[in-house]
Amino acid sequence: MHHSFLSANGGVVMSKKTAHGLRLKHLGIKTYHEAIIYMREDCHVCHSEGFEVQTRIQVTLGQHSIIATLNVVTSELLAPGEAGLSDYAWDALHAKEGDEIQVSHPKPLESLSYVHTKIYGNELSYEQMKVIIDDVLSGRLSDVQISAFLAASSAGRLTRTEIMKLTKAMIDSGDRLSWSSPLVVDKHCVGGLPGNRTTLIVVPIVAAFGLMIPKTSSRAITSPAGTADTMETLAPVHLSPQKMRQVVEQENGCIVWGGAVSLSPADDVLIRVERAIDLDSEGQLVASILSKKIATGATHAVIDIPVGPTAKVRNQSMALLLKQSLEEVGNELGLVVHTILTDGSQPVGHGIGPSLEARDVMSVLQGLPDAPNDLRERALTLAGAALECSSKVQPGLGKSIAKQILESGKAFKKFQAICEAQGGMRELTKARFTHPVVAAKEGKVSLIDNRKLAKIAKLAGAPKSKSAGIDLHAHVGESVEQGEPLFTIHSESSGELNYACDLLRDKQDIIILGENS
């Protein structure tokens, strides 16, 4: 790589070569989405360029170029003249063993100066937001730099206008779907509530009515199952954009993994960094939800906000603030948003974990006598709100129409058709190991800690092991006898079952029993 500049007489003068060549060795190190370059401590390039640990380095291979963070190797893992890359960087450069890469100092980042602007409390323009989001997506900003932007944008530091600009920048960073129908409905749940798997019931009800509902869902980020994980136990969810379109045009709806279609891709990077610093900011949450809905091509969105002490939204005032933001920013960007505040005090249904949640969904769709009523009622409320987006449905009548579609068996028939169109319906699997957890005394269930219950389900192997998780037998307000099962842990391996049981011994207050009144 040469830098050139004009001499006084107008001729081009080549500066000395500032990029250095190193031979690639495949190390097979996974860093998730972070680009890392590994170089020897005594590497001649490190010395001549002044590269130190954590330096950001421009790495070029043929037509591909990325910015990676330097990690220094002090062992014989690399031979002199060799460099290694994290798997993410290796794939981004389309690298092969023995390829020669060029390394150099990157140009100063304009986006970083805009991050500083935000840190000092100034408002950002759409253009500045767009530069930041583009650099997030291309990997030019490191995770540390992204976390500085997220922190500077949290705790109400983004104005309503900035949230709108950020949302727009995130939409513009990826693809945007368009559909043959003038009315396209979407639904979303803000989250934090185990077992709240209403999507798999809402989509077939709305599609059976005749409205278009192309649903892209996420896999679990910190929960025991995401909607895509649960759906995957029943049908393929990894569909190309072309296949997704085919399913929707044929059946009016789909339930697919959003990661396979490039909608608001910068959001996935921001969520990953937010998770690492355990940060949930209202502005980012609004931009995240709305950018995904608008990129999907939705004209109307129904958003479920569960409110409870151990849900994502902990109290009514937070919920109302979020509701107002979602509706106002959505309106500015041409999306009609209906928000519904729901009870987030305890898990929904009986199952927590992909297969167990799918079992609950199937029992509701099939109208079985043991179907969880709370899951059914929530799904009907949300489906009713979605149906009322249509001028054919009078306000207030949506839920009863949704109920008719569910009880007639049309929703189950539509769900089967969607599964077939996505690649074929699958049989649910059962876990090999189970362990019941019983009540130490008689009493009435007064509190269930969603977060601790979700943690046990994850230790048992969910969502990676599809059949792992928890089967909840007691809900808030129900009386139990001493020795009666409160919940059963399901696991694919005895080792994971033991992990989950170990946590139980540490955390006795997962389900709190009060006196029977």
Swiss-Prot record:
InterPro entries: Glycosyl_Trfase_fam3, Glycosyl_Trfase_fam3_N_dom, Glycosyl_Trfase_fam3_N_dom_sf, Nuc_phospho_transferase, PYNP-like_C_sf, PYNP_C, Pyrmidine_PPase_CS, Thym_Pase_Put. Signal peptide: none annotated. Keywords: Glycosyltransferase, Transferase. It catalyses: thymidine + phosphate = 2-deoxy-alpha-D-ribose 1-phosphate + thymine. Disulfide bonds: none annotated. GO terms for biological process: pyrimidine nucleobase metabolic process; pyrimidine nucleoside metabolic process. The keyword Transferase applies. It is an enzyme of class 2 (transferase). GO terms for molecular function: 1,4-alpha-oligoglucan phosphorylase activity; thymidine phosphorylase activity. One of its GO terms (cellular component) is cytosol. Its EC number is 2.4.2.4. Pfam families: Glycos_trans_3N, Glycos_transf_3, PYNP_C. NCBIfam families: ARCH_P_rylase (TIGR02645), PRK04350.1 (NF003338). Belongs to the thymidine/pyrimidine-nucleoside phosphorylase family. Type 2 subfamily. This is Putative thymidine phosphorylase.
